[in-house]
Amino acid sequence: MEFLLKLEDLLRKRKEELPEKSYTAELFRDGVDRILKKIGEEAGEVIIAAKNPNEKELIHEIADLIFHLEVLMVEKGISLTTIAKELEKRHS
């Protein structure tokens, strides 16, 4: 789980610096509509992968979805800590 926090920091850095040859920076440059489109695509791929017996494929697709959700969170200024607190509040 610690890696997700490191990824969040890296994503913030990409958003600030917008390096030329970065897929993540490209997502930030293109804006929220592009990020949402990617989340939709990845969510669909998770659904399809979940119907198949290949666990490795499902893990790959879930990782892609989580990555793009984190990109959206950074774009919108929402931290993983905020999400964790919301989940904790719901399940405590």
Curated annotation (Swiss-Prot):
Pathway: Amino-acid biosynthesis; L-histidine biosynthesis; L-histidine from 5-phospho-alpha-D-ribose 1-diphosphate: step 2/9. Keywords: Amino-acid biosynthesis, ATP-binding, Cytoplasm, Histidine biosynthesis, Hydrolase, Nucleotide-binding. It is found in: Cytoplasm. The keyword Hydrolase applies. One of its GO terms (biological process) is L-histidine biosynthetic process. One of its GO terms (cellular component) is cytoplasm. The keyword Hydrolase applies. One of its GO terms (molecular function) is ATP binding. It catalyses: 1-(5-phospho-beta-D-ribosyl)-ATP + H2O = 1-(5-phospho-beta-D-ribosyl)-5'-AMP + diphosphate + H(+). Gene3D superfamilies: MazG-like (1.10.287.1080). Its main location: cytoplasm. InterPro entries: HisE (IPR008179), PRib-ATP_PPHydrolase-like (IPR021130). Its EC number is 3.6.1.31. It is an enzyme of class 3 (hydrolase). Belongs to the PRA-PH family. This is Phosphoribosyl-ATP pyrophosphatase. The gene is hisE.
